[in-house]
Regions:
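Transmembrane alpha-helical segments of integral membrane proteins
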Residues: 56, 188-203
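Membrane helix-loop-helix hairpins that form the core translocation module of multi-pass transporters
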Residues: 5, 37-140, 227
Length: 237
């Protein structure tokens, strides 16, 4: 077993894990707005997706996908579309929460402007905010984490590049298996840490007022990644 290779993989993957991106963003959103069990489920989902990318890269499947123009184009379009939808959804949720708070404040203040605010108006905005930022089940949390990483074309390219550079034909099967276990363990440790720490009641309470801001930032991150992928597709077309 090549310990120096495993150490190199660990360092590179650790840096990638803590870097801001879709995985980190979705963990912050879920952990600060959902239950701890849902946040942990999301952490497991992201980690399983990372394991899948690792296996696909080690077995050469990712290389086949990257080598096929049509297949890789499809992967990029689907992935970018998913990230764009997630970003739009986060932005819409943040705006809905802001609208709900403004309406509630005007109602409590007893404002009697020309525009009459009815209970139905408040409930309507509340239902939109609830539908977008409402409670998620553990299954929903797991699938959100899974799809966020698995459908991200940049993740596929990252792992393909990483293993293409470090895993040579001379590397033993035991080292390959150990590398997959190592990356899975590091992913579970990091995202599990975020899930536990950010889902604490004190943390969620402090960040509650910042929920629209968090949603907006996350929306921008997702849509920026999607835009970068779309732009690259147009430039290379």
């Amino acid at each position: 077993m090549d310990l120096s290779l495993l150490l190199t993989l660990a360092v590179i993957h650790a840096v990638a894990l803590i870097s801001p991106g879709p995985d980190f963003a979705i963990m912050v959103k879920i952990a600060t707005q959902q239950s701890r069990s849902t946040a942990v489920a999301a952490a497991v989902g992201i980690s399983i997706a990372i394991l899948a990318h690792t296996i696909l890269s080690l077995t050469g499947v990712s290389l086949l996908i990257k080598s096929s123009h049509t297949l890789y184009l499809l992967v990029q379009i689907v992935g970018a579309s998913y990230l764009a939808w997630m970003g739009f959804d986060a932005l819409r949720a943040g705006l809905a929460i802001l609208a709900k708070r403004k309406m509630s404040a005007r109602v409590h203040a007893g404002t009697n402007d020309d525009a009459v605010i009815s209970a139905g108006d408040v409930e309507g905005v509340a239902s939109v905010a609830g539908g977008l930022g409402g409670a998620m089940s553990r299954r929903q949390g797991f699938l959100t984490g899974l799809y966020t990483n698995l459908l991200n074309p940049k993740a596929l390219v990252f792992f393909l590049t990483l293993f293409s550079a470090l895993i040579t034909p001379s590397v033993t099967t035991s080292t390959k298996i150990a590398s997959a276990i190592l990356l899975l363990s590091l992913s579970l440790a990091w995202f599990g840490f975020l899930a536990v720490m950010l889902s604490k009641a004190q943390v969620q309470l402090k960040l509650q007022r910042l929920t629209p801001v968090i949603d907006a930032v996350i929306g921008v991150i997702f849509m920026s990644v999607a835009l970068a992928i779309y732009s690259n597709l147009l430039l290379t077309a």
